[in-house]
Regions:
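Bacterial N-terminal signal peptides
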Residues: 9-17
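Positively charged n-region of N-terminal signal peptides that target proteins for export
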Residues: 1-8
Length: 334
């Protein structure tokens, strides 16, 4: 009897192991624009991001929305600005320039954010010096980065997830950088490619034709999920050509200003599903957020939206989408 029981247990173990090898999930949390710093001309202002972080500590910013970032497999945000200890290379002719201390990578680490997109218009605020300092700070802090021809591949549970990104201005000049990013990630054997696009018109609640062109090109050349940033407000979600497009996630931790035009934003948790070693599709879990927990003041600490705020943000997403929007949405792989 004991031998028969042992054989049954062994059979169950083999069956369970085989099923586990055939199916799997990878959870990726996606957040929007993050300025971990402040404007250069505000450095001595007593209410800046720098002053608050010195007082509250690195864990302050994400403390109210930390759970999805800390319990997932990978997290991605758009890092708007430079991490550099001095102002060398400052492009004084730009209207807005953002700089934070290189030590602020600890904000990402404590929040559980492993990947950042740097393909945006503020990564260049302090010229070559700022770009080099930012990459060095991210590397020293253990954060992966992608964008501007840099690519990142993260392997989870045997599945390779690829990251890259492109600015709208770059794409309009030439498509080769995006094409080469996607070609590289496909050749590297990525099972899923998440591509960041810094695009669109600031504070527009609707995506435009240029965003559509970029998304279609990215998906046509291998992107599975396209993540939009730059408009600083939420936009819709669509399925195009077998890929998923998040037109704009809005701001998240935004140290660049005290006075926000809008506090509405979105965090999305993408649960990637695999079977027989192949990507099957993604479940998107929508988490509306407000970029400050002390409105109308910006205290650089987002919180999850509830009640009427939640409903309003979901409606804004619906208004810019061609499909029904809900808290959880399944998209089958192409």
């Amino acid at each position: 009897m004991q031998k028969k029981t042992a054989l049954v247990c062994l059979a169950c173990l083999i069956l369970c192991t085989s099923a586990s090898a055939l199916a799997g999930e990878v959870t990726v949390t996606l957040g929007g624009d993050c300025v971990l710093g402040t404007r250069e001309e505000w450095k001595k202002d007593p209410e800046t991001f720098d002053t608050l972080i010195a007082e509250k500590g690195y864990g302050w910013c994400f403390s109210k929305i930390a759970e999805p970032f800390q319990t997932d497999d990978i997290s991605l945000i758009n890092l708007e600005g430079v991490l550099q200890s001095g102002s060398q290379g400052h492009q004084r002719g730009k209207q807005f320039t953002f700089r934070g201390d290189p030590a602020y990578t600890a904000i990402l680490t404590e929040a559980g954010i492993e990947q950042v997109n740097i393909a945006n218009n503020h990564y260049i605020d302090f010229s070559r010096s700022g770009r080099e300092s930012t990459r060095a700070a991210l590397e020293a802090g253990g954060s992966g980065f992608s964008g501007y021809t840099y690519r990142s591949i993260v392997e989870v549970n045997g599945y390779k997830i690829g990251f890259a990104g492109c600015r709208e201005t770059t794409f309009l000049e030439r498509k080769a950088p995006m094409y080469n990013d996607l070609k590289y990630l496909k050749k590297a054997g990525c099972d899923v490619i998440i591509y960041s696009c810094h695009w669109g018109k600031e504070y527009s609640p609707t995506h435009n034709q240029t965003q559509i062109r970029m998304a279609d090109y990215a998906i046509k050349n291998g992107a599975d999920i396209v993540v939009g940033t730059h408009p600083h407000c939420v936009q819709g979600i669509d399925e195009r050509g077998g890929g998923v497009v998040l037109w704009s996630l809005g701001n998240l931790v935004f140290g660049g200003t005290h006075d926000m035009t809008t506090f509405d934003a979105l965090v999305v948790q993408a649960v990637l599903s695999f079977e027989n070693g192949k990507y099957q599709g993604v479940t998107l879990k929508l988490m509306p957020v407000l970029t400050s927990s002390d409105r109308p003041r910006n205290n650089f600490q987002p919180e999850f939206a509830t009640g009427g705020d939640y409903d309003r943000i979901m409606q804004l997403i619906q208004d810019d989408s061609t499909l029904p929007i809900g808290p959880e949405m399944w998209f089958e792989a192409k």
